């Protein structure tokens, strides 16, 4: 019997008198086939260390621990720590860290792996309410995570992996794909969770690029330009740029020069621009003094 088997999950929760907290976005997976599929998608073996976020009662952790060199699981809910000590008692390659992943000193933590030189993969069922902040925090950290295989709300997975000229494409697609390739591996129906969430989930596989997708003069400015270009999706690029930078004649002249330099039409919408286009635009706007 597995932790994820519904009868086992229910018995564990009843034994420990556990009640779900909405504030932590807790939904526990009760489908062993899906858990095996997650591990297979992540290609976990004895030559990989894994960081898990939000292990819950250890359903995914159990599968990870059977396959990985070591698992470090970050759990914010104090009440789950003794439960994890119970459900994972047979494993000597799991460390449970009772901490918010956004506040953890990851550089120090990863040194606690017995073999810290092994590649690190992030495999997790992320809480819906904080998916994007966690992902961006990890991606932008200086830690060379090789790969992410994470479950999230289907809509967010679609946005992250979206291509230009699609409804889902936006600044989040650009922010992630600048650093990583991103592809939806498979869909997880809401019916396999306790309690069931209101929407379906998706497993997103992201692999870190050897270097960012494009080279830009100023990364912060590049991300700023991409974000502001989607503030009002139905507005043209020109309208979004002037809303942000201003509408004085001097600013307008600089914007016109920058757009001409990047060979981008002012009447286009942000969703039509590729990451490469945004790179050219940001560099051109920087060059004209914005």
From Swiss-Prot:
The subcellular localization recorded is: Cytoplasm
Where is the signal peptide, in residue numbers? Answer: none
Name the SUPFAM superfamilies on file.
S-adenosyl-L-methionine-dependent methyltransferases
One family from Pfam that matches here is: RrnaAD
Q: What class of enzyme is it?
A: transferase
Recorded catalytic activity of this chain's protein: adenosine(1518)/adenosine(1519) in 16S rRNA + 4 S-adenosyl-L-methionine = N(6)-dimethyladenosine(1518)/N(6)-dimethyladenosine(1519) in 16S rRNA + 4 S-adenosyl-L-homocysteine + 4 H(+)
Q: Which GO terms describe its molecular function?
A: 16S rRNA (adenine(1518)-N(6)/adenine(1519)-N(6))-dimethyltransferase activity; RNA binding
Chief location = cytoplasm
Q: According to the UniProt entry, what is the EC number of this protein?
A: 2.1.1.182
Note the PROSITE patterns from the entry: RRNA_A_DIMETH, SAM_RNA_A_N6_MT
> Record's InterPro entries?
KsgA/Erm (IPR001737), rRNA_Ade_diMease-like_C (IPR023165), rRNA_Ade_Mease_Trfase_CS (IPR020596), rRNA_Ade_methylase_Trfase_N (IPR020598), rRNA_adenine_dimethylase (IPR011530), SAM-dependent_MTases_sf (IPR029063)
Keyword tags: Cytoplasm, Methyltransferase, RNA-binding, rRNA processing, S-adenosyl-L-methionine, Transferase
Annotated positions binding S-adenosyl-L-methionine: 27, 29, 54, 75, 100, 125
Cellular component, GO, one term: cytosol
**What functional role does this protein have?**
Specifically dimethylates two adjacent adenosines (A1518 and A1519) in the loop of a conserved hairpin near the 3'-end of 16S rRNA in the 30S particle. May play a critical role in biogenesis of 30S subunits.
Q: State the similarity comment.
A: Belongs to the class I-like SAM-binding methyltransferase superfamily. rRNA adenine N(6)-methyltransferase family. RsmA subfamily.
What's the name of the protein? Ribosomal RNA small subunit methyltransferase A
């Amino acid at each position: 019997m597995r932790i994820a088997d519904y009868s086992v999950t229910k018995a564990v929760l009843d034994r420990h008198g556990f009640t779900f907290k909405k504030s932590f976005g807790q939904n526990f997976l009760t489908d062993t086939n899906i858990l095996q599929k997650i591990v297979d998608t992540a290609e976990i073996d004895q030559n990989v260390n894994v960081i898990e976020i939000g292990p819950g009662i250890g359903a995914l952790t159990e599968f990870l621990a059977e396959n990985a060199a070591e698992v470090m699981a970050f759990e914010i809910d104090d009440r789950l720590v003794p439960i994890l000590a119970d459900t994972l008692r047979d494993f000597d390659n799991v460390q449970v860290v009772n901490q918010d992943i956004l506040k953890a000193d990851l550089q120090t933590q990863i040194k606690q792996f017995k073999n810290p030189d092994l590649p690190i993969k992030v495999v997790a069922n992320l809480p819906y309410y904080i998916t994007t902040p966690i992902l961006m925090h990890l991606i932008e950290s200086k830690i060379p995570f090789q790969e992410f295989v994470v479950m999230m709300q289907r809509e967010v997975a679609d946005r992250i992996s979206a291509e230009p000229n699609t409804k889902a494409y936006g600044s989040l697609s650009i922010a992630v794909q600048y650093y990583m390739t991103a592809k939806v591996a498979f869909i997880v129906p809401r019916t396999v969770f306790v309690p069931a969430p209101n929407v379906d989930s998706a497993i997103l596989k992201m692999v870190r690029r050897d270097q960012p997708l494009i080279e830009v003069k100023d990364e912060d400015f590049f991300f700023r330009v991409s974000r502001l270009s989607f503030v009002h999706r139905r507005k043209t690029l020109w309208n979004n740029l002037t809303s942000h930078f201003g509408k004085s004649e001097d600013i307008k002249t600089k914007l016109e020069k920058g757009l001409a330099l990047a060979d981008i039409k002012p009447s286009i919408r942000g969703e039509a621009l590729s990451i490469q286009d945004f790179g050219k635009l940001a560099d051109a706007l920087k060059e004209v003094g914005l």
